[in-house]
Amino acid sequence: MPNKALITGFWSKVKVDEVGAEALGRLLVVYPWTQRFFEHFGDLSSADAVLGNAKVKAHGKKVLDSFSNGVQHLDDLKGTFAELSELHCDKLHVDPENFRLLGNVLVIVLARHFGKEFTPELQAEFQKVVAGVASALAHRYH
């Protein structure tokens, strides 16, 4: 179980719009096969196009708003993400491996934004959180 006080205290400093936009953008650039779920977002032809795309930025914020809700409900991640798990499984048919990839990208983006403040201890706690969120989002698939 992650250290709730450490996670929530740190998370209050995160600029969800910036970090969300960068995390989703990086996912789409580093793992280009994930772009197939976002073809309706327009130009995703290059890293600059992806990172500058307003729809990518807006959806990245939406993703991190949901993650923020999870941070507030660490004791019930499955319940917190039940509807999103159903949506991504039954309607969108997203490969659940993508949740793990996005979680790892999020940790990288947090480290980039916070530098030395994102200590190894904090990273270890966030790895637990992103693994828990990925598992909760993949729950419907099992």
Curated annotation (Swiss-Prot):
Q: In its keyword annotation, does this UniProt entry include Iron?
A: yes
**Tissue occurrence:** Red blood cells.
Going by the entry's taxonomy, the superkingdom of the source organism is recorded as Eukaryota
Question: Cellular component terms, GO, for this chain's entry?
Answer: blood microparticle; haptoglobin-hemoglobin complex; hemoglobin complex
The signal peptide here is none
What more the UniProt record tells us is: This type of beta-C chain is found when anemia has been experimentally produced.
- Please describe the quaternary structure of this protein: Heterotetramer of two alpha chains and two beta chains.
Put simply, this protein is called Hemoglobin subunit beta-C
Q: Which organism is it from?
A: Capra hircus
